[in-house]
Amino acid sequence: MASLVVIVSLLLAAFASPLLETAHSYNVTAPRVSLNPIDACWRRNPKWATNRQALAHCAVGYGKAAIGGKNGPIYVVTNPSDNPTRPSPGTLRYAVSQPKPLWITFARDMVIVLKSQLMINSYKTIDGRGAKVEIANGPCLRIRQVKHVIIHGISIHDCKADPNGMDGDGIRVFQSTHVWIDHCFLSRCHDGLIDVIVSSTAVTISNNYFTQHDKVMLLGHDDSYMGDKDMRVTIAFNTFGPGLIERMPRVRRGYAHVANNRYEKWQMYAIGGSANPIIFSEGNYFVAPEKRSSKQVTKRMMAGPDSKRWKWGTSRDVFMNGAFFGPPGVIVRPLYKGGEGFRVAHGSLVPSLTSSAGPLRCYVGRIC
């Protein structure tokens, strides 16, 4: 009888705990898992592969209107090679450089090592569903002065600096609008994992798995750049996993709605900012590190006495292992419009809602 109890306990623990290995090997989620509003929009449909563009209706938050390549044909990447000066048809670089809308998919599993940063044109979707796609060990993605880009279901890691100027970010969003980054895995890049800078806005970052990195996510170019005061970013349903140090995110001047994310033992701080940004932390799940001096969730950088009046609010967050938000300020709720709003759950539900963060292992004819 005792051995039976032990076996049952081990099985329950295995199903209840999200594993780092799952994030690396792509998630296969049990059908009974609680789905967040984005995933509930499409994952229950076993015929997802026959209408891939339906995904474009599923974003929430400030990036809700991002349509990517919804109004264009499917383009299948068949060749993982890269030639920055003369991209070959069938390669990812060839697809993203086209002027027309495209919904880009992949014929098989592949690792793409880029020789220079991948400049993504407007009205493009990179859709990794149905294949295990990695962009790694070279320069990575740049979304510059474009609009309507969706990046879904790929792994981006070990990104290098580009000799032609990119710092080595996983994804850099520069002067761009209507961008949605969903169900990606990001880790170990030379600079940031995701930067949203220089007047970029209308961005949603959701369902991603971040791990093993220092400066995770930057929103806003620098403290003196006033153009970012109109920046609006939604960060929802992500897992900030082991080995992260800071910037989850760091915000400058603009507005960030940080909702229903899971934070696992950051090393310095989780959410920070400078230059008087507005931050609303809602329904997150914070597990503090063991180090006593790092248990505060927030950090105000280069801040004088006025920083105590910054509008950094917390609502329905869960604080574990001694985590605490810091001096709470006025709550400024997001002014969503046109269907951008979504139901934010209490932080206690976040372990379930984020259990499928990262790329999903999807098979044609089956629910993801």
Swiss-Prot record:
Cofactor note (record): Binds 1 Ca(2+) ion. Required for its activity.
Broadest EC class assigned to this enzyme: lyase
Binding residue positions for Ca(2+): 167, 191, 195
Record EC number: 4.2.2.2
Keywords from the UniProt entry: Calcium, Glycoprotein, Lyase, Metal-binding, Signal
GO terms of molecular function: metal ion binding; pectate lyase activity
Cofactor: Ca(2+)
Record's signal peptide: 1-25
Residue positions the entry lists as glycosylated: 27
Involved pathway(s): Glycan metabolism; pectin degradation; 2-dehydro-3-deoxy-D-gluconate from pectin: step 2/5
Disulphide connectivity of cysteines: none
Location of the active site: 247
GO BP annotations, alphabetical order: pectin catabolic process
Known catalytic reactions: Eliminative cleavage of (1->4)-alpha-D-galacturonan to give oligosaccharides with 4-deoxy-alpha-D-galact-4-enuronosyl groups at their non-reducing ends
InterPro entries associated with the record: AmbAllergen (IPR018082), Pec_lyase (IPR002022), Pectin_lyas_fold (IPR012334), Pectin_lyase_fold/virulence (IPR011050), PEL (IPR045032)
Pfam families referenced in this protein's UniProt entry, alphabetically: Pectate_lyase_4
Record bears the keyword Calcium: yes
Membership in a protein family: Belongs to the polysaccharide lyase 1 family.
Full protein name: Probable pectate lyase 4
Species of the source: Arabidopsis thaliana
